[in-house]
Amino acid sequence: PTVDDGRPTDPERTLWVDMTLITVLTTLTIVPYLAASIQAPIPEYVAALVSSIIMVFSLLLRRDHPGALMALLLVGGLIQLIFVPFPVLSIIAVPIASYAVGRWTAGRQSRIILWLGTIGAILGPLRWRDTLAADYDSSGTPWVMWFLATTVCLGLVVTPYAVGRRLREAALIESQ
């Protein structure tokens, strides 16, 4: 007997879902940085634009090539970590990717996203700390802001992964 992980069987429907997702995310996460880069072409905005393009369009690989998705997401995240001192809207790609890797990747390989996501959830908010806490006194507020941002970022990695894993397990059990 073949084991089915529940992948969609209607290519036309998945194409429409993918195109809708990319169109919405492009509008929400790429267009603002494109406009900002045109108005004020500073390196931070250009890096935010480039990383957003990489992260959003990598989601097209989520069902068939989750490993490539993780690699491209890592590249986009590293660009943000190195060049952008503020949170970028395209981090919304992270929970979508985390779910996809949990859902469509077998075994231990799927847990790589948890390690990468945990590192990103710590380093990203650490990079943003000065920007997020710019209007607060330095007594302890910056570290509270970092802790809260880190907790939210960890939740955006772990929760979708767990949901994707459970759905994968349920589909595999049902197919047996």
Model-flagged regions — what are they?
Residues 43-46, 66-72, 79-94:
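Subset of alpha-helical transmembrane segments and adjacent helix-loop junctions
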Residues 78-80, 121-122:
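A short hydrophobic/aromatic micro-motif that marks alpha-helical segments and, especially, helix-coil
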Residues 60, 85-86, 104, 165:
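Histidine kinase transmitter module recognition
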Residues 1-70, 125, 131-133, 150-151, ...:
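N-terminal signal-anchor/first transmembrane helix of integral membrane proteins
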Residues 21-22, 91-176:
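Cytosolic coiled-coil signaling helices that couple upstream sensory modules
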Residues 52-62, 80, 94-107:
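Generic transmembrane alpha-helix motif of multi-pass integral membrane proteins
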